[in-house]
Design a protein with these regions (language model features):
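Contiguous surface segments at macromolecular interaction interfaces
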Residues: 1-10, 71-137
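Short beta-strand-centered aromatic/proline hotspots
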Residues: 57-67
Length: 137
């Protein structure tokens, strides 16, 4: 199983929206590297839900429920979606500032490729961020 991070602007689609819907298609990704990461995702992979722009924080854990398929909102047919379900909210959101302040995250894609909306997360980073958020990995 791999771990990932996916970003969403909370005024467009937030953690609370996902919890309310219980399952959602993660659409609208138009970056080729991010889309390549989505193609690598497998059912059961765990994903951090990151609120971008507003908050700039990891707020919960999702699970990939359905592997990639064509994004119905993409007229070019180049991009894909995955379906995700909420697993658990963080007891304490982990902010981007906290992550950047800790040297052990210096090589995390969230820090090194800040505009990338979908990125892999190493086992060590996953465990450390879960601990910071007050949840078990």
């Amino acid at each position: 199983m791999k771990h990932w991070l996916m970003k969403s602007e909370p005024d467009t689609f937030s953690w609370d929206h996902l919890v309310e819907k219980k399952r959602s298609m993660w659409d609208g990704v138009r970056n080729h590297m991010a889309a390549a990461h989505m193609r690598e995702m497998k059912k059961g992979d765990l994903v951090f839900f990151y609120h971008s722009n507003i908050g700039k924080e990891i707020v919960g854990v999702m699970r990939v429920e359905k592997e990639h398929y064509p994004d119905p909102t993409d007229e070019t047919a180049k991009f894909v979606v995955v379906d995700v379900v909420p697993v658990k909210p963080f007891k304490k959101p982990v902010t981007l500032a906290e992550i950047k302040a800790n040297k052990k995250f210096a090589d995390m894609r969230l820090v090194t490729h800040s505009r990338l909306s979908v990125s892999p997360v190493s086992e060590a980073h996953w465990a450390a961020i879960c601990k910071m958020g007050g949840v078990t990995p």
